[in-house]
């Protein structure tokens, strides 16, 4: 799968509520009402990621969870990352 151009990424971002491009990846941080709500969201995203065989990097800090998407094997952001960002929004709410 090809790495997306800057223009393609910029065109996709308006449809990805809460996501930004930072440090070569798509990133979104979400603050949950409680630590366990964040953990539950991570579990739901992890189950979906397993089914798609495309896994985000996930950072958990008390009630804040940050998802980062980049296709390491391709060396950049691909359509799979854009699709997974959209899927994550559907799972956790935009």
UniProtKB/Swiss-Prot annotation:
The keyword Ligase does not apply. It holds the Pfam family Pterin_4a. CDD domains: PCD_DCoH (cd00488). It comes from the Bacteria. One of its GO terms (biological process) is tetrahydrobiopterin biosynthetic process. Keywords: Lyase. Its EC number is 4.2.1.96. PANTHER family: PTERIN-4-ALPHA-CARBINOLAMINE DEHYDRATASE. GO terms for molecular function: 4-alpha-hydroxytetrahydrobiopterin dehydratase activity. Signal peptide: none annotated. It catalyses: (4aS,6R)-4a-hydroxy-L-erythro-5,6,7,8-tetrahydrobiopterin = (6R)-L-erythro-6,7-dihydrobiopterin + H2O. Belongs to the pterin-4-alpha-carbinolamine dehydratase family. The keyword RNA-binding does not apply. It comes from Mycobacterium avium (strain 104). It is an enzyme of class 4 (lyase). This is Putative pterin-4-alpha-carbinolamine dehydratase.
């Amino acid at each position: 799968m090809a790495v997306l151009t800057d223009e393609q990424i910029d065109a996709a971002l308006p449809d990805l509520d809460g996501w930004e491009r930072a440090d070569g990846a798509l990133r979104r941080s979400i603050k949950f009402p409680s630590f366990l709500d964040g953990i539950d969201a991570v579990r739901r995203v992890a189950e979906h990621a397993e089914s798609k065989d495309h896994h985000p990097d996930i950072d958990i800090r008390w009630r804040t969870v940050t998802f980062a998407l980049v296709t390491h094997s391709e060396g950049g952001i691909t359509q799979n990352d854009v699709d997974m960002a959209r899927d994550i929004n559907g799972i956790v709410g935009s």
